[in-house]
C-alpha cells in the first residue's frame, strides 16, 4: 500500500438532511435520492448497484453486489438464480438487508426486511427484456457450484446456445425475482466532523415512524 489506511479520510460537506425537508413516506425520499444519484453519479458507476446481505444456516452473513431492478409501494426487487447460495439462504431464512452508497452525493441508504419471491409472470417479464447473452447465461451457469475451470463454463454456454438455436430461451424455473419488503429504512447524509445526519424509518401500526439517530 502506498498510503496508510489510518490516514485515508475525507470531509463530507455537500448537503444536509433535516426532518423538516424529509417526507413521512421513506419510499418518496428513496425515489428522490435515487433520481439524484442517476443525475449525479458518473459512469461507469451504476446508481442501482447495492450490497445484499443474507445469512446462512450457521448464522454467518454473506454480502454481494447486485442491481436493483424494481421498486414500488411493496418493496425493492432484484433477480437471481434461486439455486444459488443466496437463493438457498433466502429459502431457509427469508430476511435480508440492502445498502446503497452514492459517494458523489455523500449518501447511503440501508434497508432491512423480509423477502418474498415475485410471481413467475414478473420474473418472465424481466427475463424477456434482458440481453440474449444474459438469458442464455441464466440457463448455462450452475451458479455458486464448483466447476473445474473457465473452459467448463464456456462448454456449458455452447451447449445452451445449441439447445436454443432454433427458439428463444424461456425463463428458467430456477431463475427469477425476489422482493424485499422493508421494515426499516435508514437514510444517511455525510456531514462535517463525522457528525452525519441519520433519519431512520420503521414500520409501526401500518405506517412509518421516523426518528433521528446519533451518528
UniProtKB/Swiss-Prot annotation:
FMN binds at residues 64-69, 79-80, 86, 108, 143-144, 188, 198. Binds 1 FMN per subunit. It holds the Pfam family PNPOx_N. The keyword Oxidoreductase applies. Keywords: Flavoprotein, FMN, Oxidoreductase, Pyridoxine biosynthesis. Its cofactor is FMN. One of its GO terms (biological process) is pyridoxine biosynthetic process. One of its GO terms (molecular function) is pyridoxamine phosphate oxidase activity. It catalyses: pyridoxamine 5'-phosphate + O2 + H2O = pyridoxal 5'-phosphate + H2O2 + NH4(+); pyridoxine 5'-phosphate + O2 = pyridoxal 5'-phosphate + H2O2. Pathway: Cofactor metabolism; pyridoxal 5'-phosphate salvage; pyridoxal 5'-phosphate from pyridoxamine 5'-phosphate: step 1/1; Cofactor metabolism; pyridoxal 5'-phosphate salvage; pyridoxal 5'-phosphate from pyridoxine 5'-phosphate: step 1/1. Belongs to the pyridoxamine 5'-phosphate oxidase family. HAMAP family: PdxH. Catalyzes the oxidation of either pyridoxine 5'-phosphate (PNP) or pyridoxamine 5'-phosphate (PMP) into pyridoxal 5'-phosphate (PLP). This is Pyridoxine/pyridoxamine 5'-phosphate oxidase. The gene is pdxH.
